[in-house]
Amino acid sequence: SLFGGVLFYSILFDMRIISFVVWIVYSFSISFLSYVVSSELISNRLIDEPISKVFSLIESIVTFFASGFMWLAYLLIVKRLVSMSNDEIKFKLLFEKWTPILLIPTLGYLSATANVVFREKAFDSIDTLMSVVFTNTIIFQMVLLVVPAYGIVILKKYYEIGYNFAVPYCIGPVVVFYLFNLIVG
């Protein structure tokens, strides 16, 4: 999912290949390393469960900042859309060009969902199954990514509301969700 997201934004913004590689290596290596180290130490009983939460926290922080980079890219997309003069072309591009490409990272979420469902035998419990599907489903992720972008475009373009209000209004709930998930999870 992370690779798909980076690929999407690198294509969209024509990023240099060096930045593309560094971003992938940095994000993936730290997240994967924290997960592997935590799992190995717990399985070998070298650390207790509470200490392992430190590694989980590191992984969550890295994921949070990676999401922040993606949101920054989304803001640049929205800013570019707002600057377009032809509304028909603007929304045509948004639907026909960018939204289909956005499906690339959602494939990662779908595979992660299937992995968790079968690994944890979520079918044995409807509550567990609903929890897994709710946090990983393609619809939920598309809502988190696409709706705020559309909201900012609409508020800025049609209601002439400045970015100082439009951005917090549309992205604020998503940030709160991530913070809540980081603290509680």
Please name every model-derived segment:
Residues 3-113:
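Selected alpha-helical membrane-embedding segments in polytopic membrane proteins
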Residues 92-184:
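Hydrophobic alpha-helical transmembrane segments and adjacent short intramembrane/lumenal linkers
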